[in-house]
Structures are given as structure tokens and as C-alpha cells.
Amino acid sequence: LTEVRTGKIWNATNSWNESWERKYKEWIEENADASFLKRHGIATDCADVAYAYRWIFARIHKLPAANRLGGSGALFTNESMRSAWQGVPTAQEWQNDRRFKAALNYLLDNTFTHTLMGDIYPVAIQPAHLSAGAIYLDLYSDETGHTEFVRRVILDSTHPQPIRILASTVPREVRELEE
């Protein structure tokens, strides 16, 4: 994976902790919108969204980032340098850092939904934080929305759906719940 031993995508001078996790949450709330990644020319599929935001935040704040690549399982980090990127210009601002964007594109090309379950660095889903009985509210507007109910959390990498949801719909009636 790392073809050369010199150079880094970026130098991490900070470390993840609870304070940085709170700052990440706040940054997402302030910056993540439907057009953010498009405005910055970042191609995505569904899993790429989670990876891209985490890596962008890490790059901005000089935090480490690491994920396992699909297929090989190799660890790809902010210190993983490929020979093709050595001469690629960097910049202070992440959106102008061509080396970072090349590395991000490589990461997004080599990860997918199944790598997320055991690879949400550094925070994994834990039963203490998300468990049966939790609710998810999707409020479309002041008048309409959708509620989903967490039935079970299965933290087993062989299980295809780690979070099991129960949901109903409108109109109100006696029905089998969607699972």
C-alpha cells in the first residue's frame, strides 16, 4: 500500500479525544449540507460520505485518520504515501491540497459500506451509546416526518445489518412493522 517511506499526506499534530469528537459533531452540523461535497468536487457513493467528512475534518485540524481498505484490509492513513503523489502539490487549505484530494479519492475508491462496520475510526458503535429502545426522528418539515425505533444492535462483523430498526407508516392501522 505505502509505496514510499518518505512524505505524508498531512502531518497529524493533534490526537482524537472527546473534545475533538464534540468539535467534529459541531463542524458537521455547521458545514455538512447536500451540496458540500459536490462544491468541492468530491465524487461519492453512500459509504463515501461518512469517510469523506471524517477525513476532511481530520485534515483541517491536523488529526490522524486511518481506515482499512476493502479487499486487502490494508491500513490506509494520513501517513500513507504513494509514489504517484510525491510530486503532487499540497496547500494550507484542504480544498486546494491536490495531494490530499488524490489520497481521499484513493480511499473512497477502496472502501465501501461493509468496511464501515468495523472501521469507523476512532469511534465505533457501542451498546452503551446506541441500544434497543433508541429512536431516530427524521423531521421533514414542521408538519411531517418519520420515526424509526431501534429494536436491536448487533455488533458482529458477520451480521449484515448492525442496527435493526422497526418502523410503521401512515395512515395509522394495525399492520406488520417494517424491519
Regions found by a protein language model. Name each.
Residues 1-48, 55, 63-69:
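Active-site-adjacent structural segments surrounding the nucleophilic cysteine of cysteine proteases
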Residues 79-133, 143:
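Conserved active-site-adjacent core of cysteine acyl-enzyme catalytic domains
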Residues 135-138, 164:
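Hydrophobic beta-strand signal
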Residues 141-147, 162:
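Extended serine/threonine-enriched, polar tracts that run as long, contiguous segments within proteins
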Residues 145-156:
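Short beta-strand-centered aromatic/proline hotspots
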Residues 158-179:
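Short solvent-exposed strand/turn elements
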